[in-house]
Every structure is written in C-alpha cells, then in structure tokens.
Regions:
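N-terminal glycine-rich phosphate-binding loop for ADP-containing cofactors
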Residues: 1-125
Length: 125
C-alpha cells in the first residue's frame, strides 16, 4: 500500500486488535509473499512453454500475463522478469518453498534443467 505521495505504507498492527486476533509472532516478509505467488505462476508457465508446448515463445506468455492478469508491464512480463532474476535463484526458492509448505512448489524438471545450464527464456524460446 502507498499513501497519496507514493510513500510505501507499513502494515497497520491495530488491525489485529480490531479483528480480535493476536499479533503474528513471525515478521511479515513482503518479498517472500510476492515471490511465492510469482514463482508458482512462473513454474506453471514453464510447464506450458517447455513441457506441454501450449505456447511457442516466452513473449506469448508475457503478453498473456500482462493483458490477462495485469502483470506489471514495466517488468517486461513474467518470463522477462524470470530472466532478470535467473533460473538458478528461482529453482532454489521453489525448492525452499516446497520444503516449507509442500510439494506444489516443486520446480518443474525442465526449469531445473534450465537452471543447471543457467539458461534464459528469451534466449531459448
């Protein structure tokens, strides 16, 4: 959340009291929350692009994500964003998420192979 001047706002802790809830003991980690959602989408996009060949090019995934889900265009789309992060970091994070919260975050085999070769989506597809 941002105020009218564009300054990022912090989570209002009084919300917990208003809802009759206790304050969480673990700190809120915005990056973790964002990455968990983005990397899960990316894992599925890899399956659509590489494994199932539903789309032929990384830019088709990006266009669909920007136009269909509102993925931020300034990031270049989901696959371009993934290229900027790197497949190794993405697979490492997905493996950590799989350990923490379950197998639905297990990286696609094709993504792990790309990470082993440090490949980029826009170079390969």
């Amino acid at each position: 959340l941002y105020d009218e001047k564009g300054k990022k706002l912090e989570l209002d802790q009084s919300v917990y009291k208003d809802l009759g809830l206790s304050t969480p003991t673990n700190p809120y980690n915005a990056e973790l929350c964002v990455n968990r959602g983005i990397f899960a989408m990316l894992n599925e996009a890899v399956r659509a692009l590489v494994d199932d060949k539903i789309v032929e090019k990384a830019e088709e995934v990006d266009l669909a994500m920007i136009m269909g889900t509102g993925f931020p265009p300034f990031k270049g789309g989901l696959m371009k964003y993934a290229d900027s992060i790197g497949t190794r970091k993405i697979t490492d994070e997905l493996l950590r998420f799989a350990d923490d919260v379950g197998p639905r975050f297990k990286p696609a085999e094709s993504l792990m192979k790309m990470a082993d070769g440090n490949e980029k989506f826009y170079d390969k597809f």
